[in-house]
Swiss-Prot record:
Gene: speH
Organism per entry: Sulfolobus acidocaldarius (strain ATCC 33909 / DSM 639 / JCM 8929 / NBRC 15157 / NCIMB 11770)
Record-given protein name: S-adenosylmethionine decarboxylase proenzyme
GO cellular component entries: cytosol
Protein function: Catalyzes the decarboxylation of S-adenosylmethionine to S-adenosylmethioninamine (dcAdoMet), the propylamine donor required for the synthesis of the polyamines spermine and spermidine from the diamine putrescine.
Keyword Acetylation listed: no
Keywords assigned: Autocatalytic cleavage, Decarboxylase, Lyase, Polyamine biosynthesis, Pyruvate, S-adenosyl-L-methionine, Schiff base, Spermidine biosynthesis, Zymogen
PTM statement from Swiss-Prot or TrEMBL: Is synthesized initially as an inactive proenzyme. Formation of the active enzyme involves a self-maturation process in which the active site pyruvoyl group is generated from an internal serine residue via an autocatalytic post-translational modification. Two non-identical subunits are generated from the proenzyme in this reaction, and the pyruvate is formed at the N-terminus of the alpha chain, which is derived from the carboxyl end of the proenzyme.
Length: 122
């Protein structure tokens, strides 16, 4: 009789939200936002693989690929508004810490923060 193979559990954590009344001087600065995403990955104990950014109108969209998943920021300076999504796999990561670092750096006066457990069920 063969033994049962036990697969390691996938631990997925996602923190996402909307940031209001942000510092407009930061929201349109692609290079500054790239640095914020890089530092957020470090704060969340994630392994940064690559960062891509696009200037779209006055705003910027940033996608950071981390070994554990991704971090995104999309900004609308004309509305002092940004959205942020931090998703990571692995018990060693802290997407909440990365999200809150971004909130602080964008100087959001108010924000929503949602958390989702994206772990496996097997």
């Amino acid at each position: 009789m063969m033994g049962v193979v036990s697969l390691p559990r996938v631990i997925g954590k996602q923190v996402y939200g909307s940031l209001y009344e942000c510092d407009t001087t930061v929201l349109g600065e692609q290079k500054v936002l790239e640095q914020i995403v890089r530092k957020a990955a470090e704060e969340g104990n994630m392994t940064l693989l690559d960062v891509k950014a696009w200037k779209i109108g006055d705003g910027v969209s940033i996608v950071a690929i981390v070994l554990e998943s991704h971090i995104t920021i999309h900004t609308w300076p004309e509305y002092n508004f940004a959205t942020v999504d931090v998703y990571s796999c692995g018990s060693h990561t802290d997407p909440r810490k990365a999200f809150l670092y971004i909130v602080k750096e964008l100087k959001a006066r108010r924000y929503t923060m949602n958390e989702a457990d994206r772990s496996s069920e097997f």
